[in-house]
């Protein structure tokens, strides 16, 4: 099973989203549930292209929340690098 870790910038992203998007008090718990799948299936996310390659992305507890991560295969560690709003023109999945 892969170990899932959050980077400091990702935690900052999530904290900022909680405030700017008026997310509910249980947001961190919801995100934690969304991350569980990565323990067993670390490559489940779609691989990103361009400047975000070779990162991967899955959806968070809301369809608009992107969870950007990398999988370090030798150590079997998933590192969450960012949380983003998919509706933003600056999102990793934006055209």
Predicted regions mapped to residue ranges:
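Amphipathic alpha-helical recognition patches that constitute DNA-binding helices
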Residues: 5, 56, 79
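Enriched for short, Lys/Arg-rich terminal
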Residues: 60-95
């Amino acid at each position: 099973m892969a170990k899932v870790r959050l980077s400091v910038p990702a935690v900052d992203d999530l904290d900022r989203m909680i405030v700017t998007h008026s997310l509910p008090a249980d947001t961190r718990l919801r995100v934690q549930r969304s991350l569980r799948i990565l323990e067993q299936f670390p490559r489940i996310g779609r691989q990103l292209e361009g400047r975000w390659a070779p990162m991967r992305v899955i959806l968070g507890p809301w369809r608009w929340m992107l969870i950007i991560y990398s999988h370090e295969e030798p150590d079997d560690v998933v590192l969450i690098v960012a949380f983003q709003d998919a509706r933003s023109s600056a999102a990793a999945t934006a055209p």
